[in-house]
Amino acid sequence: MELRLTYQEISKLIESKAGRALPIAYGGSSHTVRVSYDVDMLFKSTNIGLDLTVEEVSDGNITISYNGGMGIDFMVRQAIGMAKSRPGGELIEPLDGNRILLALGKNQQAGTLLERIELRDIRFDEQYAIIDFVPKAI
């Protein structure tokens, strides 16, 4: 089965939860999206882009690599460190290189969902983020 979400739907959800817009676009390959973020720097706002690639989906874990250039990657590592102390931070495990593991089973709500479905893949096309899953026998 597939769940298809438009990038606009995902951006609106993030904005409703985080209070900040986070535009998302197709990244040019079936497992990569481009995320952009406006950062206020001194007297002007600068848009920073980051490529996120889903490397692996298995057993409720999602391995993601990120690439935005040396300075951006450093800022992402700092943001990951800060996110670990926030609600949902238990899901995030920094890995070597520019990679993170999202351990969905460590979150009660996501864990309950994973009891009912097997997450197979997350991929992207020009319009949608596509979550491929199969229901588990109950």
Where would I find each of the regions flagged by the language model?
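Extracellular/lumenal and peripheral-membrane lipid-interaction modules
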Residues: M1-I138
